[in-house]
Amino acid sequence: MNQKQVNKLIKLLKEKEISFDSGLTDNEIEKINHNFGIIFPNDLKLLLQTELPVSSGFVHWRYGINSEKGKQEIENKLNWPLEGMLFDIKNNSFWLDEWGSKPSDFISQKKIAQDELTKQPKLIPIYSHRYLSGEPNEVGNPVFSVYQMDIIHYGNDLMDYFTNEFGIELPKSFGTIDKPKKIRFWSEMIDLNNEIIE
């Protein structure tokens, strides 16, 4: 995703009444990295540094580094995938074989799940419960919809995601990615869900 494409994307999103603030500065990006342990892949970084989407549902990163309430909101978004997993462990018998035998008590289950999730690629919140994989740190990572362990692809990459979420139509010259990149753990959860459905 280049600057021209980002500018066009922002223009189309504004036509859908998405509000934007001035883009994040290099200093703000560094603070986000320091406060939340997030390194934005370059396509997302380019978008956020060009103009920052601030409509309801979007992550207001600037607010998150300038207020305790904003920081808590971002931490809640970052913890959403774990909280959803824990809900399914407690209420829906979710457990992965590779984690070993499932302990009988929830406190032990929670500890194992937390430890296992910290080993996986970090998910960066974009909008509502949509997340971009932070790994690998490169352009073109898929966007996931995460609701408990009901995880699906919501975009093969960032551009594809915005067309799906907001019904915008990008010029054909932008090109498309035919299938999403495989992301350790998260893509496996989608495959697992598909097996259950089949």
Language-model features, listed with the residues they occupy:
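Glycine-rich, aromatic-bearing surface loops/beta-hairpins
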Residues: 137-195
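Extended serine/threonine-enriched, polar tracts that run as long, contiguous segments within proteins
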Residues: 129-133
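A surface-exposed partner-binding patch
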Residues: 1-117, 124, 128
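A short secondary-structure junction signal
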Residues: 108-112, 134-142
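Residues that flank catalytic or metal-binding motifs in active/ligand-binding sites
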Residues: 120-122, 140
